[in-house]
Amino acid sequence: MAITKEDVLEFISNLSVLELSELVKEFEEKFGVSAAPVMVAGGAVAAGGAAAAEEKTEFNIVLVDSGDKKINVIKVVRALTGLGLKEAKDAVEGTPSVLKEGVSKDEAEAAKKELEEAGAKVELK
């Protein structure tokens, strides 16, 4: 039986952020491409400025620094992301790292507060 696009999309949607990042790197190496965003023409930037004035609804949680209490930060990262111990440790030690993408403002702020209480420095982008 052949694998369909839906099967591939279902598989990808079940990957963790760390696994997805590794998959993107493998695609870049295998096919010689880059996942970097394409430069936008000057006219489109002016139009995008109006959209940026609106309040942002989706945020990425970026761990900037794990601080002195790495074990506490790893525990919080595991609880927030569902990552295994090794993946969470790699994310904490490999800062800066994106822990979650496209989350609501409330979820992002709650995660930031929890991580900062554990001793980490976090940015919401």
From Swiss-Prot:
Where on the tree of life does the source sit, at the highest rank?
A: Bacteria
- By its UniProt entry, which Pfam families does this protein fall under? Ribosomal_L12 (PF00542), Ribosomal_L12_N (PF16320)
**Matching InterPro entries:** Ribosomal_bL12 (IPR000206), Ribosomal_bL12_C (IPR013823), Ribosomal_bL12_C/ClpS-like (IPR014719), Ribosomal_bL12_oligo (IPR008932), Ribosomal_bL12_oligo_N_sf (IPR036235)
Q: Which UniProt keywords apply?
A: Ribonucleoprotein, Ribosomal protein
The entry assigns this protein to a family as follows: Belongs to the bacterial ribosomal protein bL12 family.
Q: What does this protein do?
A: Forms part of the ribosomal stalk which helps the ribosome interact with GTP-bound translation factors. Is thus essential for accurate translation.
Q: What is this protein called?
A: Large ribosomal subunit protein bL12
| Classification lineage | Bacteria, Pseudomonadati, Campylobacterota, Epsilonproteobacteria, Campylobacterales
Name of the gene encoding the protein in the UniProt record: rplL
